[in-house]
Amino acid sequence: MAEKQLRILVTGAGRGIGRSIVDQLKKNPLQHKIAVTARTESELTAAVAGATGETLVIPADATDSAVPQKIIDTVISQWGGIDAIFLNAGEAQVLPIELTTDDVWNHILNLNTTAPMRFLRSATPQMKEQKFGRVIVIASIAGLMGEGFVTAYTASKHAVIGLVRSAAVELQKYGITVNALCPGYVDTPMLTKGLEVSAQRTGKTIDELREVLAAKQPGGRLLTADEVAEAALSFIDSDGTGQALWLDAATKKFY
């Protein structure tokens, strides 16, 4: 990982992959400065507990159009800049396409695609000025392939990969990299929530559905949030940009 202390923002930091990213950052001997944001303050407070470096807890709703700018401004005001952002906040709703209302569609696209764009847009001027930045988006294998009953989620992840690729081309000359990580099925609270809905639709148990998803992956199992976090953190040291890299559950390597 980086050889100097960094000022890092993690969105969706209260649980799942975001929480695991924070947990691994806390272990780094460089004592990175860690800002965390999500809706629930108690989850954020728990996430940064035990950190030896400086932390900022910023409870907020990323779907509010004004929030990303306010969060970036807070981090810069507190620490004089921002070096890396892990854009992890996201949501899926399991619905057949005929029941995917405009409200559902707009909410998912807002959180999964528009909010990352707003965070990136807000951080870009500071990163350009300091000629360094790392932006890592936790996308999904659903951004590289189709998946039934999660139309809005799949569309949002395809779109955010387009955002990553375009921004990477534009910002590379400023020392800013923008990359997406596309893990397969990850054992997180969001996955469990989706399986609960699928169980009602299919009549299968949650355990049976977990086995179905695990069988789709090269390793025959679900990824863990820690595995995804470890892969995401590797982007900090890389000069590569514009990538949408698939992480599988067999070798834990990129494709």
Name each model feature, range by range.
Residues 14-15:
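Conserved glycine-rich cofactor-binding loop
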Residues 140:
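Residue(s) in the substrate-gating loop at a strand-loop-helix junction
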Residues 145, 237-255:
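Short C-terminal tail/terminal secondary-structure segment
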Residues 120, 156, 164:
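Active-site helix of classical SDR
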Residues 26-46:
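Conserved glycine-rich Rossmann-like NAD(P)H-binding loop of the short-chain dehydrogenase/reductase
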Residues 125, 169-173:
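Alpha-helical segment proximal to the catalytic Tyr-Lys
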Residues 96-97, 104-109, 213:
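Substrate-binding pocket helix/loop in short-chain dehydrogenase/reductase
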